[in-house]
């Protein structure tokens, strides 16, 4: 797909990897719709700086998704990037409620948005890219359990939609490993960060730009679908 002049929706586009994706796609000539649910002011800023627009809605709410997509005239690309951070579980939240929140955003959101996007892409073609994680392949500890489960299920959604929506729409995923981010700096001591980097065969964390480049490859290549592109420095061979 030639990106220039096309329209992309990036969920969770107001920070981190989502912001990087918005800025890089805009630089490639795309009109970018910046989605978020809580950081409306930040989304508006990014949209203004990239010549796009902000669209605030909860991707886990079917009614909100339907209403939001009614406001989108044409759509060529959907990046399902929004996620629930496994380190931000409220202490008082019960297991069942946390499960629902994680799966609501990490799986139900991409499910709802992908089908809504597919309707917009009928007859014109399009690209869907899901942002997964290396945790999809791992036996998770208690903190990461729901997150890992949701990302593994996202792989099933990716491959299933790739078959269902072909030939006009390709559906792929990118599964990052450790990525340099503000969250990593906040959660881990310098010693812990260094230990993690040393455990990676390439001896460093990845960058948001490297993940964004992988997404762009999947958007520009018209003969790849149903694939999980692993960007993890050799941490996990699949």
Label each PLM-derived region with a short phrase.
Residues 89-91, 95-103, 184-185, 192, ...:
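Substrate-binding pocket helix/loop in short-chain dehydrogenase/reductase
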Residues 155, 165-179, 224-231:
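Conserved Rossmann-fold SDR core element
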Residues 14-15:
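Conserved glycine-rich cofactor-binding loop
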């Amino acid at each position: 797909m030639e990106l220039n002049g096309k329209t992309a929706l990036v969920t969770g586009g107001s920070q981190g990897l989502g912001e990087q994706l918005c800025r890089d796609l805009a630089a490639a000539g795309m009109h970018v719709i910046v989605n978020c649910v809580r950081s409306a002011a930040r989304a508006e800023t990014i949209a203004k700086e990239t010549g796009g627009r902000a669209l605030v809605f909860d991707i886990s709410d079917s009614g909100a998704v339907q209403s939001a997509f009614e406001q989108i005239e044409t759509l060529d690309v959907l990046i399902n990037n929004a996620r629930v951070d496994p380190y931000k579980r409220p202490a008082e939240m019960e297991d069942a409620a946390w499960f629902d929140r994680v799966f609501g955003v990490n799986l139900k959101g991409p499910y709802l948005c992908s089908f809504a996007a597919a309707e917009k892409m009928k007859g014109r073609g399009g690209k869907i890219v899901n942002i997964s994680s290396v945790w999809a392949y791992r036996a998770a500890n208690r903190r990461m359990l729901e997150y890992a489960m949701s990302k593994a299920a996202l792989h099933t959604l990716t491959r299933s939609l790739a078959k269902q929506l072909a030939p006009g729409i390709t559906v792929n995923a990118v599964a990052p490993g450790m990525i340099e981010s503000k969250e990593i700096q906040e959660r881990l001591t310098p010693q812990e960060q260094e230990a993690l980097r040393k455990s990676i065969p390439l001896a460093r964390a990845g960058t948001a730009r490297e993940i964004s480049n992988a997404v762009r490859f999947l958007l520009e290549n018209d003969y790849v679908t149903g694939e999980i592109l692993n960007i993890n420095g050799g941490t996990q061979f699949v």
